[in-house]
Amino acid sequence: MAGELEGAMARARSFALPTFAQRAIADARSGDAFPAAGLTAQVARQLVRDERSADANPKRNLASFVTTWMEEEAVDLMQEALDVNAVDEDEYPSVRKFENRCVAMLADLFHAPDGGRGAKAAGAATVGSSEAIFLGGLAMKIKWEERQAKKRDQPGADAGKPRGTPNLIMAGNVQVCWEKFCAYFDVEPRYVPNDADHLCLNVERALGMIDENTIGVCGILGSTYTGHFEDIVALDAGVEALKSKGLEVPIHVDGASGAFIAPFAFPDLQWDFKLKNVVSINASGHKYGLVYPGIGWIVWRDWSMVPKKLIFTTNYLGADLPSITINFSKGASQIVGQYYQFLRLGREGYTAIMSNLQRTKTFLTEKIAGTGCFRILSADVGVPLVAFCLKPPEGGERRSFDEFDLADKLRERGWVVPAYSMPKDIKNMCAPPL
């Protein structure tokens, strides 16, 4: 007992010591086991801060696609909502109002039909575009299952015909979350191969891969690799033509990056709900939505595109609450931040910011191409990034360095511009996006 008392008194005395004079600072803390005793707040903070100090500076990370700065007023509002669970709308009704208003604003921005606008807008906030894509993909899969069930119930249908495996058509340059969706939800991924002339979706080849078990086609508005906008107009026309063959194939637009760019930088571009076969769109608020991570959005054309199986109602928190997200609890801060940005910037503000980004892209493209060392892979119409690769050496000589070496040298100077390999069908090409 005396030993325990002495130990407690020693710990109490240590609380008065300067941070770097305390014993805990010198103790090795591997994190392999749960700590037996706690630390003073100042020591715990210092240990965490010191370990993070070796990380890259987010503002010098030129390839993360993530917002790294917000106004002080936005940060204040988000900090005030740190302890709020957004799912508890009975206790925090303002957060659900903000979310619904953001969905309605996005439905308007994406030209949803009258039945999917205002209070009728169909969508939800998510923790990122991955969750939004899972929801969009699940909606397409369930709708496909419902169509297949109706076909089996028709007079003369072959009741003994085995059920086919659902498949999803997408280019090889999709983000990894699409691979996860197919793996998690038992969907066959059908990848349209990329090549040096098709860095994004080859629409003609995609249409040729569609069959009666295709739940939908993914069109990317802003490729992770090169920033390309895929040709959603051609995709829409193609799946429309397939209806004459009895094939009903919806389009989901992966607008993780581009859905917050195209409406402002390229307002005449056709890609959204103006096209009749686009049924759902995801967007990342923490990318060009200009909010700190993580927040994403899923917006459907209207509620008829949302299967009832996706909607759950619970009364855990004191009232009957409908939910269409995969994740249950989530912080309210990012929703508050997104609503602030929509109010603060409006169309005019977002247009000005996207125009500035496009000008920066043009400037960097000209400077990088002007060195004569690089081939530009990104397009004029697309995400405001510059994707490039080293030109082959003249005379067939072997180069002593590659894009990964270039990325390492930039990292030595404090800049994060990671190089990565292009989709597997494109051989011997790497692209550092900037």
Predicted regions and their residues:
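Glycine- and acidic
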Residues: 82-90, 116-124, 163-165, 189-193, ...
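N-terminal entrance/gating region of PLP-dependent enzymes' catalytic architecture
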Residues: 1-120
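Short, solvent-exposed loop/turn segments at the edges of secondary structure
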Residues: 276-278, 291-294, 333, 381, ...
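Structured alpha-helical segments in the cores of large, soluble enzyme domains
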Residues: 99-106, 174-179, 202-210, 327-334, ...
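PLP-dependent aminotransferase class I/II
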Residues: 291, 324-340
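Conserved PLP-enzyme active-site core in the AAT-like
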Residues: 124-312, 317-320
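Buried hydrophobic packing segments
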Residues: 99, 103-106, 132-141, 178, ...
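Conserved C-terminal alpha-helix-loop-beta "cap" of PLP-dependent enzymes
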Residues: 45-49, 183, 187, 194-196, ...
